Amino acid sequence: MNKENKTQAVNKAKNTAKVAKKGSSITKHKTYTGVRFFRPKTLQLAKAPKYSRTVRAHLKVSGHLDNHSVVKTPLTTEKAMKKMEDENTMVFYVHNRSTKPQIKSAFEKLYNVKVRSVNTLNTITGNKKAYIRLAADSDSLTLANKIGLI
């Protein structure tokens, strides 16, 4: 027996002695007697989404929403025209993921008017409408004329 084999044999003997002292542990299967079934835990893989599901994070990361893509097209229905005449409010289709502050700043920059408030409405067809109420010093009819609605 050379020195390497001797050290291997000693290590093997020590491990065997350790196991003999500790005892071999056999886990007995527990018998469940309850009526409720607990679904076994399965492997949960780490998620790697293609894009963020939160609106603000998505818009900040991509940064593709400029003023022209936030405010899309004006609405020229009778209801929208009545709002324009009576309440000094313009109605526009806007980007689905845009927020009220984004709509307000984009509208002010595009048309050089002051906006008092913005109300939004998600339609059944999947579009988003913005009811943009102009400030008292701005007139919606003048703006509509300038855009070419009237």
From Swiss-Prot:
Q: Where is this region: Disordered?
A: 1-24
Q: Which domain of life is it from?
A: Eukaryota
**GO molecular function (one):** rRNA binding
| Biological processes, Gene Ontology terms | translation
A cellular component term, taken from the record's GO annotations? ribonucleoprotein complex
**Which InterPro entries is this protein grouped with?**
Nucleotide-bd_a/b_plait_sf, Ribosomal_uL23-like, Ribosomal_uL23/eL15/eS24_sf, Ribosomal_uL23_CS, Ribosomal_uL23_N
What keywords were assigned to this record? Ribonucleoprotein, Ribosomal protein, RNA-binding, rRNA-binding
Q: Where is the composition biased (Low complexity)?
A: 7-18
Please give the family membership noted in the entry: Belongs to the universal ribosomal protein uL23 family.
* Entry-linked HAMAP family: Ribosomal_uL23_A, Ribosomal_uL23_B
NCBIfam families the record matches: PRK14548.1 (NF011118)
Question: What is the protein's given name?
Answer: Large ribosomal subunit protein uL23
> What species was this sequence derived from?
Tetrahymena thermophila (strain SB210)
